[in-house]
Amino acid sequence: YVLEQLAGPEIPQSLFTAVDVEGEALSRATTIDKIQLGTGMFKGLGTGGDPERGRALAEEHIENMRALCREQDVVFVVSGLGGGVGSGVTPLLARAAKEAGALVLAFVLTPFTCEGTRRQKFARESLSELKQIADGVICLPNQQVFKLVDERTTLVDTFRMTNGLLAEAVRGVWRLLMHKGLIEIHFSDLAAVLRGSQSESFFAVAEANGANRVDSVIRKLFTHPILLESDASGPTSAALISLIAGRDLTMAEVNKVMAEISGRYPGAQIIMGAAVSDDFKDRLSVTLLVSHQMAVESEAPTPGPASSQETPVLSTSPRMTQELSSS
């Protein structure tokens, strides 16, 4: 699960809530707050891959979800789309957080092609609905991970890799919002890049140290499989760049990073931030988010839900929520 890969000192576990229909999956979650769906209507029997059933299960707990999100400035919803829980519950969670007054960012995975057209359809519908609700959506298609694996990579390792990439995005945005910098990026800046029902967003996080850390970070960013996919999607409309380093960060390093990235995305609106932290002594970390405005199709997909690793998570400074199952 993505939740397991986010565990660590950087993001306190007290900020996580795990949501699932399966009691066994919840018992393995290390979060303090947990919501088990289906204890009433379906008594923990799952969703059978049906998003409408997942939505019905979540409706039973909607007040509980709103209560968790009250007095939270920002809520991260982390989920896999495609199945009953991810597709049915994720948009409802996002709506509950919005109704509680929080700003909402969704981080989602979509299914591999081999998972079938049914799960892909549910994922597309859920993603479309999420874009109408959340302040920003970052989506990682699992299919892109095939660029990183070979024919000997096991199924378990492949899913671990996709979860790791999504966790990387969550940590990158967390740092961006939590490290108050010399040049700050505000939530409104982030939402401006990610918002829009007809936009598609891509991300990469890279880190390096040593004398050539800028060159190394740029190389890692520009060869990141998700950004390579972004380049194939057409002109970039906006790019957000966040740099975090120790007190040894120089103006020349900042200028070089910005020049390289701005040169790669000519014509894009550029938003940048820079922070120094003693936790990043001798290290340079760069988070890059880019957004494309997609052509409007004549027939929009019907809004609805979808997932491949499914566990919504609710989040406060920000608070996080993840769905855990693949039902």
Regions found by a protein language model. Give the residues of each.
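Tubulin/FtsZ superfamily GTPase core signature
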Residues: 1-327
